[in-house]
């Protein structure tokens, strides 16, 4: 009932947004027929996706999604965009949900936006425009955002942390025509900035002048020996090793047979070691020298870094997972932030809290069923054996 009322409440909002927005792609995985829109790659032996809900789902229908089902496998699964599109002078807004129900240890959870694609040949070498979503392996817990530009896949110079629990989380990307971007986790902004600043789309605006030469009188030694520091006259009077003054000749020592007895040598506590002058700040120090900066002749601005160079024609998951069980759902691509927000909110409002409540109940139940200590467990085992 609550789920029905939620949908009835959000329906007018979705209709109002839809009047002024363009939805390029939407997938909710509500039933088996949704899988007809997706293609399993045959490029090699990939792991299979299956339609299912989570064991700690918040809604019987909303909780369904496509889940990775085989451990230690690569996955390649894609769907065609009904009408390929470009984002010229429009925002690109991508949203989807990820639920690492298996408590993932190493694996990807990101989605790709691709140009024209033969889904049966889809693999890790297939060209894509954007790769976006969580990536977890070992200590790595980050949100990936990679752009393809001029034949290169550009890595983000930021690494915001992704969610790493077993609950459902939404990820949203907004790319705007002014070459800015925003990344959201559960509709909370975790990063934003300028495309040119945060990826190596373009050469640097300035470079070091190759003709600039360090002056011969430039002083870049910050610390020097104190010229006023003088070695004491008695510094070297004491040797490094001396006979042990506490040593005595053993009573059984026979000089005719054993030779002349000599005291063993020990470190001299008065030995001062190598003398070094005191170090001081160089009064003539000018700082670290660096060539002056000049305008880079190879730099050319591009006010369309945000733009897909080829129409977006497909979406896909190209992943590796050691432990399977990740559920993907609620995929949407639009030119409207409001539409994506309304779509995700309608499907996730209250779901995460329900999942948390179910997780707490499960944990409490497991704690109640567990023996108080290992000794009780061992006693029970002994009684069974008797």
Task: Show which residues each predicted segment covers.
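Short, aromatic/His-centered strand-loop micro-motif at the edge of beta-sheets
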Residues: 147-172
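Short surface loop/edge beta-strand patches of beta-sandwich-type extracellular domains
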Residues: 70-89, 156-160
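Beta-strand acidic-aromatic groove motif in beta-rich domains, primarily in extracellular
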Residues: 104-114, 182-185
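Localized edge beta-strand/strand-to-loop motifs within extracellular or lumenal beta-rich domains
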Residues: 167-186
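A carbohydrate-recognition surface predominantly in extracellular/luminal proteins
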Residues: 87-102, 331
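Glycan-recognition/cleft segments
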Residues: 51-58, 112-150, 157
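Extracellular glycan-recognition surfaces and repeat-rich motifs
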Residues: 33-65, 126-131
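Short, solvent-exposed beta-strand-to-loop segments that form ligand-recognition rims
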Residues: 188-309
């Amino acid at each position: 009932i609550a789920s029905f009322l939620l949908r009835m409440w959000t329906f007018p909002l979705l209709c109002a947004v839809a009047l002024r927005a363009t939805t390029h792609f939407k997938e909710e995985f509500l039933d088996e027929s949704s899988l007809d829109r997706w293609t399993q790659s045959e490029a090699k032996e990939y792991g299979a996706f299956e339609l299912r809900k989570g064991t700690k789902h918040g809604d019987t229908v909303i909780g369904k999604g496509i889940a990775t089902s085989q451990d230690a496998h690569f996955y390649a699964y894609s769907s065609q965009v009904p009408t390929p599109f470009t984002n010229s002078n429009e925002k690109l807004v991508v949203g989807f949900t990820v639920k690492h129900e298996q408590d993932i240890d190493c694996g990807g959870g990101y989605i790709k936006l691709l140009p024209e694609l033969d889904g049966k040949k889809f693999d890790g070498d297939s060209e894509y425009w954007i790769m976006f979503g969580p990536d977890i392996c070992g200590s790595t817990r980050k949100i990936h955002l990679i752009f393809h530009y001029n034949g290169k896949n550009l890595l983000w110079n930021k690494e915001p942390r992704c969610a790493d629990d077993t609950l459902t989380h939404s990820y949203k990307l907004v790319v705007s025509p002014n070459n800015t971007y925003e990344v959201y986790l559960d509709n909370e902004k975790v990063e934003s900035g300028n495309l040119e600043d945060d990826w190596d789309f373009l050469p640097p605006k300035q470079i070091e002048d190759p003709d600039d030469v360090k002056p011969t009188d430039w002083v870049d030694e910050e610390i020097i020996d104190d010229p006023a520091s003088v070695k004491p006259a008695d510094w070297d009077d004491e040797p490094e090793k001396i006979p042990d003054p506490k040593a005595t000749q053993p009573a059984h020592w026979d000089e005719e047979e054993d030779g002349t007895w000599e005291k063993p040598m020990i470190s001299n506590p008065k030995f001062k070691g190598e003398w070094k002058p005191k170090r001081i700040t160089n009064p003539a120090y000018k700082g670290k020298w660096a060539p002056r900066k000049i305008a880079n002749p190879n730099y050319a601005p591009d006010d369309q870094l945000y733009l897909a160079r080829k129409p977006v024609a497909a979406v896909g998951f190209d992943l590796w997972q050691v432990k399977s069980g990740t559920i993907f759902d609620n995929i949407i691509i639009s030119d409207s932030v409001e539409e994506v927000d309304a779509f995700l909110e309608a499907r996730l409002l209250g779901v995460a809290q329900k999942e948390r409540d179910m997780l707490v109940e499960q944990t409490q139940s497991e704690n109640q069923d567990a023996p108080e200590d290992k000794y009780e467990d061992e006693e029970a085992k002994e009684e069974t054996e008797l």
